[in-house]
């Protein structure tokens, strides 16, 4: 029986819209969604609400949780925080290990968090590009083996590319723009990509794709 894996990137982030936010932020490497990012997340939810998704996994960074939460509300599903979907822990992007909100704080703001779920893969800072590729491929393969229903992964530009390549193999170009959708259909080690960074559900898209 074939499985569908949906892979989405978070919506627009506040520091992309207001770069000065970084200078005074308490957690500068964990920006929230921008105002238009929330609109994108809602549009993503509208796009996916008729799909037969059984599980939603998201990176523990705030922007991915906020994006996934919009989808989870429309699909009436819990959120599983999976560190294997985290941002690339690139020391050129982050001078120190990024601080994210604790589960206790997140629970106060996101009632759909599945507190019984623990991450299957946990990255370490700093992380090379090779380690990123291995980590994201491993979490994608781990999740499709453990959860055989249709699933949604919500991550970052780097983890959208890495999880996709981890399943389809090779080195395909992935259009990992903000709030894009990748759709993979297959089983075991035989996957094909039906959508590559689709943004047809968005009312507004970025003019140039950036990861950081």
Predicted feature locations:
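Phosphate-handling substructures
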Residues: 31-32, 75-134, 194-196, 206, ...
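Acidic, low-complexity terminal tails and accessory targeting/binding regions
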Residues: 1-2, 80, 87-102, 149, ...
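Short, well-ordered beta-to-alpha junction loops that form the rim of enzyme active sites
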Residues: 58-61, 82-85, 154-158, 197
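Glycine-rich phosphate-binding loop signature in dinucleotide/nucleotide-binding domains
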Residues: 50-52, 143-149
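Generic beta-sheet signal
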Residues: 5, 147-157
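Active-site-proximal alpha-helix that buttresses catalytic centers in soluble enzyme cores
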Residues: 2-81
């Amino acid at each position: 029986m074939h499985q569908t894996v949906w892979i989405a990137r978070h919506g627009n982030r506040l520091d992309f819209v207001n770069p000065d936010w970084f200078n005074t932020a308490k957690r500068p490497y964990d920006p929230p969604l921008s105002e238009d990012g929330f609109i994108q997340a809602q549009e993503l939810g509208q796009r996916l609400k008729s799909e037969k998704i059984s599980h939603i996994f998201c990176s523990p960074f705030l922007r991915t949780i906020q994006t996934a939460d919009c989808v989870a509300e429309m699909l009436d599903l819990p959120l599983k925080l999976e560190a294997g979907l985290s941002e690339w822990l690139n020391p050129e992007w982050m001078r120190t290990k990024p601080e994210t909100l604790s589960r206790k704080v997140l629970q106060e703001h996101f009632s759909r968090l599945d507190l019984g779920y623990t991450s299957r893969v946990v990255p370490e800072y700093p992380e090379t590009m090779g380690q990123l590729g291995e980590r994201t491929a491993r979490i994608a393969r781990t999740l499709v083996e453990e959860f055989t229903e249709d699933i949604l992964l919500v991550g970052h530009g780097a983890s959208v590319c890495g999880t996709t390549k981890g399943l389809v193999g090779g080195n395909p170009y992935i259009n990992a723009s903000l709030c894009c959708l990748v759709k993979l259909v297959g089983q075991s080690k035989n996957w094909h990509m039906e959508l590559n960074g689709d943004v047809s559900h968005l009312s507004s898209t970025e003019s140039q794709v950036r990861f950081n």
